[in-house]
């Protein structure tokens, strides 16, 4: 059994404040919940189990039982998970406030210990101090935390997490923040708690404390596209669909600059109960536009590219080619439902085909040419070094002619109207008959940046913003984009 979950269950009964704060879905009756996908630690109850997605941030960090309360570590409402969540720089004072909150919610003194022992020893068979019966008294105060970096913020979710040696399939990683505090002072606090326990429980308490307070930080694997669930999409079949986010809020909005002081609210039980009584939910429709999602789409596009088209004689655009095994794309992939991807694919291949034909490259659909190997990488514009190298190699394959120490290639083949319009925009209103390497780079980048200008995108989706940030962006009408109207980034 998870120690933190057990402690919340038993300590709920000692006061009205605890009854309100320590209510976990994992300790309540199970309700229908979404299917699980990853193995990891539930941030709400701290147990290692199968995780499902959070309705507040789309990350997999909540178990099937706790999902019924829809709590997210990015919420505004000061529930237990939010009060255990700290952001960016953590001072010694912040940690002291956290430990004071723990001491308020999970006290150990003679009266509490005797009460729990008397509750357990109700039958003759329970005269021994079995660890299973006193698991809730074996919760040490540690500075063990799961951390994650979202955009420009680093979040630390403190708690007591069992089974640290288990496989972690989530983007959260363990860190030990004891160096931000006084190690000897933390030892002293735990030794004082241990003093009230029977000797056999003291031994187990000490073992748990030292194992969770002396470990080395675990490596951070970073965020991946699959770490975010698609279940928050309004329409899972639409690549431009908005994401529906639910956040728990309170009437008195707290400023993000005071983020790390949320745990101090438990010191005044009356005020805390008043704040919690004003709790409500806010719903936001948020764009999925960000570098993480865009990179995933461009990677898929690169993998599905059919470079043979650039030397073909098909009289239609690349995506409309049928009955040609060398040029016809596999249309079953969801990515082709995104009109932006279609436009980028058609326009880039149309431009490269015009360059190839202009410079006398002979070939056909089934021919094997060296230039083909560089075409898929032209879509990976987020990797500047690889993309530049691919453009340079492609330019060399066109056998440029040197004029006044500058190499040029011909450009006199027909192109479609969209490519023509984009070239007019980036080449000062004219379409040159010869292009140098710099011109080719500019045109190729413009064809992609027209729809995915990755230079100005967030790293992670906006659903990872704090509730205050979402509220501010919503007032400015900046949570959604204009892609549904087929307006590009440039427009």
Curated annotation (Swiss-Prot):
HAMAP family: ROTA_NSP1. Residues 320-491 are annotated as: Interaction with host IRF3. InterPro entries: Rotavirus_NSP1. Belongs to the rotavirus NSP1 family. One of its GO terms (molecular function) is metal ion binding. This is Non-structural protein 1. A motif (pLxIS motif) lies at residues 485-488.
């Amino acid at each position: 059994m998870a120690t933190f979950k057990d402690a919340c269950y038993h300590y709920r009964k000692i006061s009205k404040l605890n009854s309100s704060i320590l209510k976990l879905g994992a300790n309540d009756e199970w309700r229908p919940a979404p299917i699980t996908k990853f193995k990891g630690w539930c941030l709400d109850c701290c147990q290692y189990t199968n995780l499902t997605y959070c309705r507040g941030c789309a990350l997999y960090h909540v178990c099937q039982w706790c999902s019924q309360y829809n709590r997210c570590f990015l919420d505004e409402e000061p529930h237990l998970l939010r009060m255990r969540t700290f952001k960016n720089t953590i001072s010694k004072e912040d940690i002291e406030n956290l430990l004071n909150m723990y001491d308020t919610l999970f006290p150990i003194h003679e009266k509490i210990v005797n009460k729990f022992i008397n509750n357990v020893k109700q039958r003759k068979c329970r005269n021994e101090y079995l660890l299973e019966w006193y698991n809730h008294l074996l919760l040490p105060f540690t500075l063990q935390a799961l951390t994650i970096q979202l955009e420009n913020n680093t979040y630390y979710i403190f708690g007591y997490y069992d089974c640290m040696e288990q496989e972690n399939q989530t983007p959260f990683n363990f860190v030990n923040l004891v160096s931000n505090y006084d190690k000897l002072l933390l030892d002293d606090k735990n030794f004082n708690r241990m003093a009230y326990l029977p000797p056999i429980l003291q031994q187990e308490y000490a073992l748990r404390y030292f194992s969770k307070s002396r470990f080395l930080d675990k490596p951070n694997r970073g965020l991946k596209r699959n770490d975010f669930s698609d279940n928050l999409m309004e329409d899972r079949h639409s690549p431009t669909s908005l994401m529906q986010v639910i956040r728990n809020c309170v009437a008195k909005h707290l400023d993000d600059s005071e983020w790390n002081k949320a745990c101090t609210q438990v010191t005044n039980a009356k005020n805390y109960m008043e704040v919690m009584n004003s709790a409500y939910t806010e719903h936001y429709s948020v764009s999925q536009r960000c570098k993480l999602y865009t990179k995933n789409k461009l990677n898929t596009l690169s993998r599905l590219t059919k470079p043979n088209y650039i030397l073909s004689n098909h009289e239609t655009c690349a995506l409309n080619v049928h009955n040609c095994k060398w040029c016809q794309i596999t249309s079953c992939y969801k990515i082709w439902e995104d009109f932006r991807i279609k436009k980028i694919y058609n326009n880039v291949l149309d431009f490269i085909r015009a360059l190839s034909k202009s410079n006398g490259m002979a070939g056909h659909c089934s021919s094997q040419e060296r230039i083909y190997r560089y075409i898929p990488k032209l879509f990976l514009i987020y990797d500047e070094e690889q993309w530049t190298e691919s453009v340079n190699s492609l330019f060399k394959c066109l056998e440029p002619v040197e004029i006044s120490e500058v190499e040029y290639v011909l450009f006199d083949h027909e192109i479609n109207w969209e490519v023509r319009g984009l070239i007019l925009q980036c080449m000062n209103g004219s379409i040159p008959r010869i292009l140098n390497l710099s011109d080719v780079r500019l045109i190729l980048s413009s064809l992609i940046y027209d729809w995915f200008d990755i230079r100005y995108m967030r790293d992670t989706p906006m659903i990872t913003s704090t509730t205050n940030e979402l509220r501010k962006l919503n007032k400015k009408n900046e949570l959604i984009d204009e892609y549904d109207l087929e307006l590009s980034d440039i427009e």
